[in-house]
Amino acid sequence: THRVLTTPVPAPKDLLGKFEPVFEVAALPLQAGNESQVRAQFIERLRSQGQSVPMFGLALKNDSNYYLLTLRESHRPTASASPRDRLDVSLLQQHVIATLCPSQQEQEAMLYSKDDHEALNWVRQGKVTAALLLNPTKVAEVKAVASAGERMPHKSTYFFPKPLTGLVMNVMEG
């Protein structure tokens, strides 16, 4: 589930300067008439390259770029790290959300979207200050976290269709 920020964020140059030690940053410039192609390329690169390395997408209000943030090797979790600590959503929380939203109040003001285009549209329309796109959590990652006896981070999965609660939780007596 993508994170969408409603609180102020630093100017792009300042923000990217904070991320440079931790992330390799690739900018995909937007120009008049090419947004749909650049957006498609942005999402495709996030999905394909993000399968092998921790990678996040970033869109900022009033900025003419999409950014791909690839976690540098030196900041990636080791093989001995817990399954929860190796999740993209945990890495995003540790390296990005903690920087952009240091207070609990700012984190509680965050919105969530399961749809890439919805999150990016909110930014382009000026409704929010930033969108952070993640790759979906894999079922194998959920199983690894559960097998280790850990809990999944908040809003880290989105499975559909969802079972109806009444069919699963309530005892039906005749």
Predicted ranges, named:
Residues T1-G174:
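Surface-exposed, charge/polar-rich loops and edge strands
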